[in-house]
Curated annotation (Swiss-Prot):
This is Replication restart protein PriA. Zn(2+) 2 binds at residues 546, 549, 568, 571. NCBIfam families: priA, PRK05580.1-3. Its EC number is 5.6.2.4. Residues 304-471 form the Helicase ATP-binding domain. CDD domains: DEXHc_priA, SF2_C_priA. PANTHER family: PRIMOSOMAL PROTEIN N. One of its GO terms (cellular component) is primosome complex. It comes from Synechocystis sp. (strain ATCC 27184 / PCC 6803 / Kazusa). Binds 2 zinc ions per subunit. It holds the Pfam family PriA_C. ATP binds at residues 317-324.
Length: 831
């Protein structure tokens, strides 16, 4: 039976009716590449409210949708007979009112569809497609049906009924029957017409709760006649508090399931299914006590603890100043008041260390949420947050959407970090911006912590320094009065002139040589993974490039007997390293630039006694790899961590005394207005990993531009001096934090069509946007082609004190189906 979709609801129609009887609902239907709000009838006896997740018929399928409003009157020109009923409510009241408002705001602010925001915010599995199933209608099936279908023309129908009768439930999926029965469609149509079978759509299923069996001790009576195995089973169960998961009990005794069943028949134990949350498994942590606070830490806590309602706090503390302890003190206060806390970190690699410290203080009240979890673990973490108990969730940017009850505090640690901005998927949201809006809606304080605050956060709090809801708190010294590590700048031009061809300067070589003797550990930071930045022919100059992108391929060394690879870091294309030049067949190929693999190769050659661990996105892809590598390092199984940006983000390893920056210039030479800020933040953060323990630290930065303003600011740990130089340049050009930016980018396989589309969008924006808005471009992106798609863009720039609303519907009408439009509000990069 084909069911036509309900008529499309009228755009702009008011769905927020206040009458008590509201027989229709506007449902945002989950359709691929489309956001459709459709009107459905609410069946008698079914309670539906805004934010419910419902199953609705749409054509010949059943889809998931979100109720966005209920109404007493139909939109004009919408006949009641066309309205189909909602099938069922999958999750009732899933969105709290303030959460619902957050999603609406996010869709509007980031210029995207509400359904896109909902798909991103929900855990996996809540809006999945249903499947069609065929069920035997036993009441209508005549007993002599085999005789009736004995004709050869009825062979398909006979096969269907035979299969259905062999099924315990009397039904199979349409997909399964199609595989088993040739010519299924005609035979099934015949059976449906006779009403011997039914066709139905199984409601969309969320990721299901895990329901293993729990064994509970009911009676421990020695007078019962028991076998030795049964008695031992009861003793094990009693010693474990009277309750154990069945699987655990079978291993602990050990015994078989029949032994447990026999005890249940005697009435000594009960066996029942019980939900077991698939929370991320973490090692046990010893409890810790709060240390003595420094005067600055005490002042910070005294300022934040009394805050009620929305407040924004910028906690600016130098590396090693004890920001995390301030977080812990304030979190303890919030938990004591029955409130929950959300803690966001920029990288998965940071969650193990931070989680361990929180769990040592707060035990099992701490949960984690990030992209490294399985779908089941994500789903169950959401379920745990909905139970209503006060708790702490620690996670990466996606954790901002966890529905914590009675939220009392949001913390963004390392708030300056670019990883808080989503750039690979729509919407291109920034977790800091969303956190600010969520804190406003839920009326709780927001703490932004960093040793190198973003210029936006710094400017906001100082521009509103008389606002009682804005607070600037500073931790200017390290705990226990430990000094910041001295920073030595090495001019690599001088090294080359004096005959040093190594990637390590003589100063760094000396420090590395002393590391083993002093039984200390260190970090080597390089801004690129892989071995070499590009491969070029020394005979003809040919550079090996990606066939899909306008970029060179990076050389990656493969361990063991594997062949060396050339890999694209944009589309992940990989090919075997050729032995001769593809252009002129010359065997003289040269590798240029350095990555983490090349650094470790040089270490092995020059310092064979030093043990190292590579810590980059190539070595941490596997689940749990971040923790495993850091634990290995903390146990003293390596002398050096060699890695990329991950090493700069809040790692607190007391045994590190040396930090070496192999090539600082790779952070500075970008055609982007944020280049200096990012370079200063990265170099300052990685420098701050040294000297956090009892032993003093040292930092060696290798560069070809030692007089660069960023290098000089990092040398003296001078954040205030850096921003005093950087902010006037931003203000002069009206770049953030003084101006606002929106990047519109068109992508497609036909370059001329992409260019033509972005030019038409630019003309439209010039016509419709206020004169105070500046349109820069259109122009090709700095990398014109990625993954075989050409990229053209324009930048909308305007003063931060005005509000600009893009003519989205008009812009979308300009874009043909072959051109994808990406809108990035507040872009962190305009390349």
């Amino acid at each position: 039976m084909t069911v036509s979709p309900s008529a499309l609801a009228e755009l702009g129609f008011n769905y927020q009716e206040e009458d008590s009887v509201r027989p229709w609902a506007a449902v945002l239907v989950d359709l691929p590449q489309n956001e459709g709000v459709y009107t459905y009838a609410i069946p008698p006896g079914l309670t539906v409210q805004d934010g419910d997740i419902v199953a609705v018929p749409f054509g010949n399928q059943q889809l998931g949708g979100i109720v966005v409003g209920c109404l007493t009157k139909l939109p004009p020109d919408l006949p009641p007979e066309k309205i189909k009923p909602i099938q069922d409510v999958i999750v009732s009241g899933f969105f709290a009112p303030h959460y619902w408002r957050l999603l609406h705001w996010l869709a509007e602010y980031y210029c995207t569809e509400l359904i896109t925001v909902i798909r991103m915010a929900l855990p996996p599995g809540l809006l999945q497609r249903s499947q069609r199933r065929i069920k035997l209608n036993g009441d209508r099936l005549p007993s002599d049906w085999p005789l009736f279908l004995s004709q050869p023309s009825h062979q398909g129908a006979r096969q269907i009924l035979t299969l259905l009768q062999s099924s315990k439930e009397g039904d199979y999926s349409y997909r399964y029957l199609r595989q088993k029965v040739p010519g299924l469609t005609k035979a099934l149509r015949d059976l449906l017409k006779r009403q011997w079978v039914e066709s139905y759509l199984e409601p969309p299923k969320a990721v299901q709760p895990q329901l293993p069996k729990m064994v509970t001790l009911l009676n421990f009576d020695p007078s019962f006649k028991l076998t030795e195995l049964q008695a031992r089973t009861l003793i094990v169960l009693k010693n474990q508090g009277g309750e154990m998961w069945l699987a655990d009990l079978l291993k602990a005794v050990p015994c078989s399931a029949s032994t447990i069943q026999s005890l249940a028949k005697k009435g000594l134990v009960a066996i029942a299914e019980r939900e077991k949350l698939r929370l991320f498994q973490q090692p046990s942590i010893n409890a810790s006590q709060a240390p003595e606070l420094t005067p600055a830490q005490k002042q910070a806590c005294q300022t934040v603890l009394p805050l009620q309602g929305y407040h924004q706090v910028l906690l600016h503390g130098v590396t090693g100043s004890g920001k995390t302890e301030v977080y812990l003190q304030i979190c303890g206060d919030r938990l004591g008041k029955g409130q929950s806390v959300l803690v966001l970190v920029p990288e998965i690699g940071l969650t193990p260390q931070l989680t361990d410290r929180f769990r040592a203080r707060f035990g099992n009240k701490v949960a984690v949420y990030h992209s490294g979890l399985s779908s089941g673990e994500k789903y169950d973490t959401w379920r745990q947050t909905l139970l209503g108990h006060e708790q702490i969730v620690i996670g990466t940017r996606s954790a901002i959407f966890t529905p914590l009850p009675n939220l009392g505090l949001i913390i963004l640690d390392e708030e300056h970090d670019s990883s808080f901005k989503q750039t690979q998927l729509t919407p291109n949201y920034h977790a800091r911006t969303v956190a600010q809006r969520r804190a406003e809606l839920e009326q709780c304080p927001l703490i932004l912590g960093s040793a190198t605050p973003s210029l936006e956060s710094w400017h906001t709090v100082h521009r509103h320094q008389n606002d009682p809801q804005r607070h600037y708190l500073e931790l200017p010294e390290r705990v226990q009065s430990r000094p910041l590590p001295p920073v030595q700048i090495v001019d690599m031009r001088a090294e080359l002139k004096q005959g040093n061809r190594s990637i390590f300067s003589r100063a760094l070589q000396t420090a590395l040589g002393e590391l083993k003797a002093k039984q200390q550990q260190g970090i080597l930071f390089i801004n690129r993974r892989g071995h070499s930045t590009f491969v070029s022919c020394r005979s003809c100059g040919y550079v090996l490039e990606c066939p899909n992108c306008d970029v060179s391929l990076s050389y990656h060394y493969v361990q063991g007997n594997g062949q060396p690879l050339l890999r694209c870091h944009y589309c992940n294309h990989a090919e075997i390293q050729p032995k001769v030049c593809p252009e002129c067949s010359s065997p003289y190929l040269k590798f240029f630039g350095s990555g983490t693999q090349k650094v470790t190769e040089a270490l092995t050659q020059e310092f064979p006694d030093l043990r190292w661990i590579r810590f980059d996105s190539d070595t941490t892809r596997r689940k749990g790899a971040h923790r495993a590598l850091l634990d290995q390092f903390q146990r003293g199984e390596a002398d050096l961590l060699v890695g990329t940006q991950m090493l700069t983000k809040g790692l607190d390893l007391a045994q590190i005394t040396l930090v070496g920056v192999v090539a600082a210039d790779s952070l500075l030479n970008f055609a982007d207005y944020r280049s200096a800020e990012r370079g200063f933040q990265t170099l300052t953060q990685v420098s701050g990993r040294a000297g956090r323990g009892e032993e003093p630290g040292q930092v060696i930065i290798q560069t070809y531009t030692p007089r660069h303003p960023v290098i000089q600011a990092v040398k003296t740990h001078n954040y205030h001096g850096f921003i005093a130089q950087e902010l006037p340049q931003r203000e002069m050009l009206n770049y953030p934090p003084y101006g606002k930016l929106i990047l519109l980018r068109c992508l497609g396989t036909n370059e001329r069509e992409v260019e033509k589309t972005i030019q038409a969008i630019a003309v439209l924006c010039e016509q419709l946007l206020p004169k105070t808005v500046e349109i820069l471009g259109p122009a090709p992106a700095s990398i014109l082609r990625i993954a075989q798609r050409y990229r053209w863009q324009l930048l909308v720039k305007y003063p931060s004190f005005i509000k600009v609303i893009l003519p989205l519907e008009r812009i979308k009408q300009i874009c043909p189906s072959s051109v994808y439009l990406d809108i990035d509000v507040d872009p962190l990069s305009i390349d």
